From Swiss-Prot:
The lineage of its organism: Bacteria, Bacillati, Bacillota, Bacilli, Bacillales. Its main location: membrane. InterPro entries: HD/PDEase_dom, HD_domain, HDIG_dom, KH_dom, KH_dom_type_1, KH_dom_type_1_sf, Ribonuclease_Y, RNase_Y_N. One of its GO terms (cellular component) is plasma membrane. It comes from Bacillus anthracis. The gene is rny. One of its GO terms (biological process) is mRNA catabolic process. Keywords: Cell membrane, Endonuclease, Hydrolase, Membrane, Nuclease, RNA-binding, Transmembrane, Transmembrane helix. It is found in: Cell membrane. This is Ribonuclease Y. It is a single-pass membrane protein.
């Protein structure tokens, strides 16, 4: 029972505490609400006061801004008025100027009208004077025709003939002076380029023969080479196409033939047979075939070495092999391969001096005589064969034209083609480069003098300097100075057309006038 009472008391106390707490909290909340309301009222009052102050401040600032804008607007209006006034003044001034110009133009127009009237009157006077002058001229012409017994056309023809004679003489003099100046300048420039090229190119003096000599260990070997009833020597000559000359020359056999490649093949084969000691037809045939292969390989190596030395690359392999064959070809005793290399060097050097393509120039110079490698096997001149080869192996058009034109058969179409022809002549004409037989030499000198003396007015001619120059003495009363120049050109053209010669020939016409008096 006591526990129940305590529980009830506890519940009662809790209830009383809750009620008391509720009222206490309510009173506290009401107090807070009243305080918040008072604070809110205070804040609202302060905000109203601040808003009033800001309003007054904004009004003041707005008034100041309005005053400032009004002042600026007044200033701008004043400036615009001033500018408009200035523009108006300028327009008025321009209008006054235009008025003055208009007056000036009116005055000028009046002056021009007066001048036009004056010119019309003057033109009429001139026409009248021209008419009178025409009548006077006609009368004078009629009188002159009556006095001179010549018509107008006849007199005109006589005057024109005299003028033509005088003018033709003056033109000839001017042409001569121009030729002299052009020749001097061209010779000077050409000598500079050629001297530079020759100084930088050192070439060998080459002389080739048509025989080769094979040394023997003893004279007994000659009998073995001949063989029983000459079978060995006949076999060797048949296979190589070379003549073997076995005479009293001690320990030597001479090989004679005009084909250097065959002669070289025979020399190598015979040398191998002599070293081997076994000499009979079957062995000879074997050695000749082996030697032929060695020569072909050597020719290919020579072609490759040549292109490497000259600096020409990209040639067709067959063209390289044909180029190597030039080592065994000669022209007037000059080795054609050495000549081609020399022409390539000279052409390249001259092309470099003139600003042309040096590599292309060397290529053209190296291949200019390529036709000589097979001209004894194929029909046609070496120029035609060379053009066919270059075209077949798709060489540059400049190279093809250089081959075709280096002997003047066709016109050169490029500077490089002209340089190739010049280098070819330079290489062939240098001392010691080529040789010719005595008979051909004498025939050429006689032909030079015969051509020179075939012209009227030539007194005597002399071929000098081994046929490099011909001097012609003319009659001074028959040929004047201008005719002497024409004679030199005509003789030069005939020499170029009728003679075949290496290098160039100088034609000199000498006209000498002597005045002789005797004092007594």
């Amino acid at each position: 029972m006591s526990s129940t009472v305590w529980i009830l008391i506890s519940i009662l106390l809790a209830t009383v505490g809750a009620v008391v707490g509720f009222f206490v909290r309510k009173s506290i909340a009401e107090a807070k609400i009243n305080g918040a309301a008072n604070e809110a009222k205070r804040i609202l009052d302060e905000a109203n006061r601040e808003a009033e102050a800001l309003k007054k401040e904004a009004l003041l600032e707005a008034k100041d801004e309005i005053h400032t804008l009004r002042t600026e607007a007044e200033l701008e209006i004043r400036d615009r008025r001033s500018e408009l006034q200035k523009q108006e003044n300028r327009l008025m001034q321009k209008e006054e100027n235009l008025d003055r110009k208009d007056e000036t133009l009116d005055k000028r127009e009046l002056q021009l009208e007066k001048k036009e009237d004056s010119l019309v009157a003057r033109q009429q006077q001139i026409e009248e004077l021209e008419s009178k002058v025409g009548e006077l001229v006609q009368k004078q012409q009629t009188e002159l025709e009556r006095i001179s017994n010549l018509t107008r056309e006849q007199a005109k023809a006589i005057i024109l003939g005299k003028v033509e004679s005088e003018v033709s003489h003056e033109i000839a003099v001017m042409v001569k002076e121009s030729e002299v100046r052009a020749k001097e300048e061209a010779d000077k420039k050409a000598k500079e380029i050629l001297s530079l090229a020759m100084q930088r190119c050192a070439a060998d003096h080459v002389a080739e023969t048509t025989v080769s000599v094979v040394n023997l260990p003893n004279d007994e070997m000659k009998g073995r080479i001949i063989g029983r009833e000459g079978r060995n020597i006949r076999t060797l000559e048949t296979l190589t196409g070379i003549d073997l000359i076995i005479d009293d020359t001690p320990e030597a056999v001479i090989l004679s033939g005009f084909d250097p490649i065959r002669r070289e093949t025979a020399r190598i084969a015979l040398d191998k047979l002599v070293q081997d000691g076994r000499i009979h037809p079957a062995r000879i045939e074997e050695m000749v075939e082996k030697s032929r292969r060695e020569v072909d390989e050597y020719i290919r190596e020579v072609g490759e070495q040549t292109t490497f030395e000259v600096g020409v690359h990209g040639l067709h392999p067959d063209l390289i092999k044909i180029l190597g064959r030039l080592k065994y070809r000669t022209s007037y005793g000059q080795n054609v391969l050495k000549h081609s290399m020399e022409v390539a060097y000279l052409t390249g050097l001259m092309a470099a001096e003139l600003g042309e393509d040096e590599k292309l120039a060397r290529r053209a110079g190296l291949l200019h005589d390529i036709g000589k490698a097979i001209d004894h096997e194929v029909e046609g001149s070496h120029v035609e064969i060379g053009v066919e080869l270059a075209t077949k192996y798709k060489e540059h058009p400049v190279v093809i034209n250089s081959i075709a034109s280096h002997h003047g058969d066709t016109e050169p179409t490029s500077i490089i083609a002209v340089l190739v022809a010049a280098a070819d002549a330079l290489s062939a004409a240098r001392p010691g480069a080529r040789s010719e037989t005595l008979e051909n030499y004498i025939r050429r000198l006689e032909k030079l003098e015969e051509i020179s003396e075939s012209y009227e007015g030539v007194e005597k001619s002399f071929a000098i300097q081994a046929g490099r120059e011909v001097r012609i003495l003319v009659k001074p009363d028959t040929i004047d100075d201008l005719e002497a120049h024409r004679l030199a050109r005509d003789i030069r053209k005939r020499i170029e057309n009728e003679l075949d010669y290496p290098g160039h020939i100088k034609v000199t016409v000498i006209r000498e006038t002597r005045a002789v008096e005797y004092a007594k």
